[in-house]
Amino acid sequence: IDDIIKGEKIEQKKFFSKSFASTSFLMDDKLSNLDQFKDILSKFINTDKQEIIKSLLDSNLTGRGGAGFPAGMKWDFCRKTKSEKKYVICNADEGDSGAFSDRYLLEDQPLKVLFGMIICGYVIGSDEGVLYIRGEYPKSIEAINGAINSLKEEGLLGENILGTSFSFDLNI
């Protein structure tokens, strides 16, 4: 750095060819099709809600928005809040210029986005989720609509999901 500041020529001989990140921000393929979705969803909606929150808290999972707020705490606060109607909101506005993480998730991982919303709805006691997707992302809207329709056709979204008393619907 000192050489750069002085304006001297720098001989660059070292290149890093591997990542030193402690975690991967890319999602795995465990929810890439409807059969996997159904199996995992069935396990979750037959699990005690407090156990799911404890697992979230223990995992230290945080949101992708940059604030680093623990997801388990957020879900626990929502679950304990008394309200006649609760909503799960996915704000995929992506207001930061040059940011495409929301678009990537919506277009390439729509089942994972919807899975998170459905499980959140189960845990906090909500029967409705709303996604805000900016109009400049028509492919994102198309991908999410397609995933919503597929889930409804398979009985994985809507009334009495997988034969349980849990109902959840999604709107864009």
Label the predicted regions.
Residues I1-I172:
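Feature of Fe-S/electron-transfer and energy-metabolism proteins
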